[in-house]
Amino acid sequence: MMSLLAASVKTKNLPQQVLRWQSMVESECSAQGVPELVPYVLGIIMVESGGNSETTPDIMQSSESQGWAMNTIKNPKDSIYYGVKHLKGAFDDAKKNGITDLSAIVQSYNFGRAYLRWLASNNKQHSLPVADLYSKTVVAPSLGNTTGAMVKYSNPIAVAYNGGYRYKNGGNFFYSEIVKQYVDFDGGTGGGVPQPEGIGFAKSKYPEGFG
């Protein structure tokens, strides 16, 4: 599965506050046998916390991936350990389900790995409308939102897509698109517009029963 990770995958637009974690990320990815995941982990750190461990010690928001309450993890090292473990598991699940789309795998970091199984069993390919559907019909109802209720979400990608909304208790179906601002996993050449600091960090909000 890791062969689908092109060696040319690069990060972009990352501030020093995120890059300061690069050596720790490289060490942990190497320890878990997945050095290819370093760019993705750094991009996820940017989206989840901006690398600001002073305000968000769980810089990868990894607590939920273990079935714990948000921010249970109190230090960046543990956050990276569990975050890499979760992402590695997503790549393993993708392989089992015949999925090679990196966007789908990155989206599953937010939705939970059940998203990959859902894509496979429903013969669907990840896209923003498909992620929208999963958020509305699977994630949100599992957390009590059975009416499709939406909440305002000011991220520029969301504003461009639907005026700036996502589903209450539905995770963040824009997640993969947001990470793409910081990781060229679609073969881009970089130069994207950085997400403004503080606008819509995409916190994962699913229970691990979902992952």
Kindly give the residue locations of the regions a language model identified:
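Non-catalytic cell-wall polysaccharide-engagement segments
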Residues: M1-L4, K12-V18, Q32, W68-K85, ...
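An acidic intrinsically disordered interaction segment
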Residues: K10-N13, G43-G50
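N-terminal carbohydrate-binding/catalytic regions of secreted carbohydrate-active enzymes
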Residues: Q22-I44
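Glycine-rich, acidic and aromatic/proline-enriched surface loops and short helix-turn segments
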Residues: M46-N52, F111-A114
